[in-house]
């Protein structure tokens, strides 16, 4: 019995030592080498950066620092097992500076490598040009095209008695051919505004239009229930 107990304790001690060795990370203050050979591929609303990783044994990841809007900083990281970073969220096609830094397991950062990206037209802009809003029974119906299946919100606003637009509905979608309806309205003419917004807060140009919803009347089921069928 004592031999079995000693054996079990020995095994547990070996496991504990192994776990300690596995989780122990040597720390230092030596910064890793920077990435090199950076290639930029501009995409709608962003860019893909391909690079050569440094040879540092304790490399942890690569980080990209950039500004989405004036004064709004953002970052994205990629592990040491890949050699590309995808940057998204730009609302315009203006040139931007992106800084790439390598980070090691001691969280030391390399000197930054600066590259220039020039995003293609943002999805919100492209989708916004396809927006349509038409009269529907008891409301309005919106249509839009989203070929890239971007995550978007379609925001519908209506003008109130103070001539101010207020949000009355929002449709969340990633489908290619999107459509949605807002109902519960009378037939009086109404001023609407509709636009696209993405998860970074970028918005398309708004479509403003005046629409009179179609008359809608709830069907009286008692008419059918009260009807008799020949032969009954």
Stretches found by the model and what they are:
Residues 2-10:
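Sec-dependent signal peptide recognition
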Residues 7, 33-45, 65-79:
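Long alpha-helical, hydrophobic tracts
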Residues 13-16:
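C-terminal motif of bacterial Sec signal peptides marking the signal peptidase cleavage site
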Residues 18-58, 92, 105-150, 201-231:
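Pro/Thr/Ser/Gly-rich low-complexity, intrinsically disordered linker/stalk tracts
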Residues 46-73, 140-169:
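Solvent-exposed loop/turn segments flanking beta-strands in beta-repeat/beta-sandwich domains
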Residues 60, 85-115, 176-214:
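Beta-strand-rich modules
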Residues 74-81, 168-176:
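Short beta-strand segments within Ig-like beta-sandwich modules, predominantly Fibronectin type-III
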Residues 78-85, 124:
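Blade-loop segments of beta-propeller domains
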